[in-house]
Amino acid sequence: SSPSMRNTSIDLLDAIPRAVVAIGTDYPHGHLLPSHHHRRAQLLYGATGVMHVRTEDGNWVVPPQRAVWIPPGVAHEVLMLGVSTRSVYIEPAAVTAMDARCQVISVSPLMRQLLLEAVELAPEYDEAGRDGALINLLLHELLRSTHLPLHLPLPKDPRLLGLCQEFLKRPNAHVS
C-alpha cells in the first residue's frame, strides 16, 4: 500500500501531474495558518472542529459538514479550532465552472466519504482505474454542491470594521 497523504504540504506536491491532490492534516487546537495562497484551487474541508476563514471578501465560520471553496490564487487565513482537514487542491483548468469567489458549501454524506477516501490515494493515482473514478465523482459532487449563506461581508470603514471584528470575537457582547 502507498503512503497516505497525511500532514504533508501542497507545496511539495503542486506539480504532480494529476488534476487533484488530496491531503489530510491534523492541526493543534487554536492553530493559525497565516494568510497564504495556492496556485491550485482548494476545497478546504474540516472533518472535525470549526474553522474561521478570513479572506478579502469577508469572514466565514465553517462548522463540520461544510467546506470552503477557495479559488486559485485567493489569499486566505484560517484559524483551526479542533480541526482535522481533508483538503483537495485542484488544477484551475478542471474547475472553470466553479465560482471565482470564496464560498461555503454543504458537504453531502457521499462527498464527505469521497474526501475521506481521497486522502488515502497515492499521489499519482491511476486515472484510468477506481481511484480516478473516485476523484472524477468528487469533482462532479463539488460542481453540484449547495452554497450556504455563512458569509459575513465586512465594512470598509475602519471604525465600523473595528466594531464588527470585536463582535465576531465576542458575539454575545452587546455594544451600545
What is each stretch, according to the model?
Residues 1-50:
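Generic protein-terminus/edge-of-domain signal
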Residues 31-38, 78-80, 97-100, 127:
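Short histidine-centered beta-strand/loop micro-motifs
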Residues 57-72:
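Short acidic-glycine-tyrosine-enriched beta hairpin
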Residues 73-102:
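Ligand-binding loop in jelly-roll beta-barrel domains
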Residues 100-112:
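Aromatic/histidine-rich interaction motifs
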Residues 121-126, 141-149, 164-175:
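Basic, amphipathic alpha-helical hairpins
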Residues 130, 134, 155-163:
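N-terminal positioning helix adjacent to the helix-turn-helix/winged-helix DNA-binding module
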